[in-house]
């Protein structure tokens, strides 16, 4: 059975657990899912790169949440996270990589987007 790597952050555990349940529920019908937890969003691509070098995966799904705070930290984290995942995708063009790191202004936006974004992005991974 082909393997999918799901790399997720350690922040917002309750929400990440829901994202994992949704993704695994969709993927496990056709794939074996391996999970790896990164300390934060910026570390997602480094962890995935390490796992890709040691294992044979047909796809990687990134799960994370970045919520704007009162400082510019949000801008730095979201920009660097998306840049590093994009760079990894360029380096591994033969593997399907989907970024489901959800960037929001607040918790109501997260609640509004979490389920549908996770479902859509997990299904997009299958289509690649």
Where are these regions (language model features)?
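Glycine-rich phosphate/diphosphate-binding loop of Rossmann-like nucleotide-binding domains
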Residues: 2-35
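Structural motif
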Residues: 5, 58-60, 95-101
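Short, ordered loop/turn segments at secondary-structure junctions
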Residues: 10-11, 65-66, 101-105
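Active-site rim loops that border cofactor/substrate pockets in soluble metabolic enzymes
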Residues: 26-54
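Glycine-rich phosphate-binding loop
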Residues: 47-85
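Short, acidic/small-residue loops that bind anionic groups at enzyme active sites
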Residues: 77-103, 111
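Internal, active-site/partner-interface "lid" segment
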Residues: 108-115
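A charged, well-structured terminal subsegment
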Residues: 115-128
């Amino acid at each position: 059975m082909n393997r999918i790597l799901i790399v997720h952050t350690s922040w917002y555990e309750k929400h990440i657990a829901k994202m994992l349940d949704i993704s695994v529920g969709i993927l496990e019908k056709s794939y074996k899912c391996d999970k790896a937890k990164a300390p934060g969003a910026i570390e997602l691509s480094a962890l995935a790169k390490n796992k890709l070098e040691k294992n044979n995966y047909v796809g990687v799904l990134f799960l994370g949440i970045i919520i704007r705070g009162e400082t510019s930290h949000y801008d730095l984290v979201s920009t660097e996270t998306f840049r590093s995942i994009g760079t990894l995708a360029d380096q591994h063009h033969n593997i399907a990589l989907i970024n489901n790191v959800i960037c929001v202004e607040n918790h109501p936006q997260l609640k509004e987007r979490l389920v549908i974004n996770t479902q859509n992005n997990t299904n997009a991974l299958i289509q690649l």
